[in-house]
Amino acid sequence: MGISNIIFILLLIGGFTFFAVNIKKIITNIKLGKSIDRTDDKGKRFKTMMRVALGQSKMTRRPIAGVLHIFIYLAFVITQIELIEVFFDGITGSHRAFMEFLGGFYTFIISLIEVLSVLALVATFAFLARRNLLKIPRFQKSEMNGWPKLDGNIILYMEFVLVMCIFTMNGADEALRLVGESHAAGGGSFDFAISSFLGEHIFGGMDVSTLHLLERIGWWGHIFMVFAFMNYLPYSKHLHIFWAFPNVFFANLNPVGKLTNMESVTKEVKMMLDPNADPYAAPEPLPEGAVPEKFGAKDVTDLHWMNIMNAYTCTECGRCTDSCPANITGKKLSPRKIMMDVRDRAEEIGNGIRKEGKDFNDGKSLLGDYITEEEVWACTSCNACVQECPVLINPLEIIMDLRRYLVMEESKIPSELVTMNTNIENNQAPWQFSPTDRLKWKDE
């Protein structure tokens, strides 16, 4: 075992350890939410996950962005096959260890990876152009200023460098093999789809020492970019690469638009309607140290854990905001910003608890310090955001819980809704006329 193998093993251990620590922090943040059971109908959940998360079925609702994303997605998935060999070579000191064993299938796999890498490169440039040159409107909203905009570009730059490293590694190795200097077994061309051309026409004619250097630069560059990419993900919206699968699996299976009832309210209503219930019975005393349950949500700790997982899964693609009628008509509401705010607040509370303990209290809350009442009441409850999300995120659940808190805990409600509620109570309709006049329209 040489020094390069030791360096690789240390890099491997350090990279995965750092990644695991950060993922554990995020899982802890998600667990700040209240408990909710999303384990029913596992078969349907698994099929939905395969169709939506793995099959990318909702991405192609917008064909251009959808197809470009699928190019990058397929390249990412298939490249992991080659990464297994790279890890094996790095640990053992071998060179293309699987080539002799797999034979022609190895050539097919590497060729497929190279073709997909070219398509991913095309998609990368297209996405950079859409964000920075064409300035697609949904990427220019106020919540995308600063870090979110930079984050979207950084990952695309990393994608470009990673693909260049792959082609440098394979192209230089092809040129070495053509002159009988490659460390890989056998001789002659690898017959890879792209790098065989590069090896002959781009790297051909270079001296052997330069080719060996370029091959090693490509190999180590590939490794460094993989670990850099992996450990950048916990700080990036691109963490959806991993969270999309559990997020879709645990998504709400109820029909879109069906709102959940609050258990505490349902319990009270059932008790009121029970003819055998004692109307003078005192409420059950709370356990010692327990806090009365809130109506709705004021902070992320009042949401359920799935809402917070939704926030960490958010791709910031803006399809929700782009389809939101409130946002389209100039209202302050942006469903994407709602999810970003939930994630930021969960991070803030999680970091505070890790530093100061469970009694951490910064005097802030999700409602008020991150999301304003104006945003909450701008929502029309149309579910356009839920319908458009490619990974089944549900901003409406969060908005509804924030509204419930405002109405039921703080008695804050727009005057228009006060009038409507009064009319419903008195007239059994939102409009201010007597129920006896309902059929007068037929006489007009």
Question: What residue spans do the PLM features occupy?
Answer:
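Acidic, Ser/Thr-rich low-complexity segments on the non-lumenal side of membrane proteins
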Residues: 51-66, 262-315, 319-323, 328
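Short acidic (Asp/Glu) and glycine-rich catalytic loops that position anionic groups and cofactors
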Residues: 25-30, 223-226, 316-322, 379-383, ...
